A protein has these predicted regions:
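Alpha4 helix (beta4-alpha4-beta5 surface) of REC/receiver domains from two-component response regulators
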Residues: 62, 83-98
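Receiver (REC) domain active-site loop signature in two-component systems and cognate sites
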Residues: 55
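Charged docking surfaces used in two-component/phosphorelay signaling
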Residues: 15-19, 23
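Acidic catalytic/metal-coordinating carboxylates
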Residues: 33-36, 59-62
Length: 119
């Protein structure tokens, strides 16, 4: 079963992504912040991570850096607010596979995540 870790401090986005990917047959883990995300990965390595960049506490870029040090094989797709170009560039240089700007097209995100499992 394909597994996905969804990390976003906005509950509505977590629930939307959860619903879409459960329908696709994914095993979903949800995290509301960076620390929860890292703890979830330590418990069970996901097949892919959808990671918000702007979160209180441990932000997405720091989570991405830690993921790439500890689990470089996990593909990470980032989600960022419009206008955060520098942060997006930093994330791609750090190892993110792809990015989406909020508000994003849910079907494009779905297709990108599915593509991570085909490669």
């Amino acid at each position: 079963m394909k597994s996905l870790l969804i990390v976003d401090d906005q509950k509505g986005i977590r629930l939307l992504l959860d619903e879409v990917f459960r329908r696709e047959g994914f095993k979903i883990t949800l995290a509301a912040n960076g620390m929860e995300a890292l703890q979830a990965v330590e418990r069970e390595i996901p097949g892919c991570v959808l990671l918000d960049m702007k979160m209180p506490g441990l932000d997405g870029l720091e989570v991405l850096k830690r993921l790439k040090i500890g689990w470089p094989e996990i593909p990470v797709i980032i989600m960022t607010a419009y206008g955060e170009i520098e942060l997006t560039e930093d994330a791609l240089e750090t190892g993110a596979m792809k990015y989406f700007t909020k508000p994003f097209d849910i079907y494009e995100v779905r297709d990108a995540v599915n593509a991570m499992f085909e490669n």
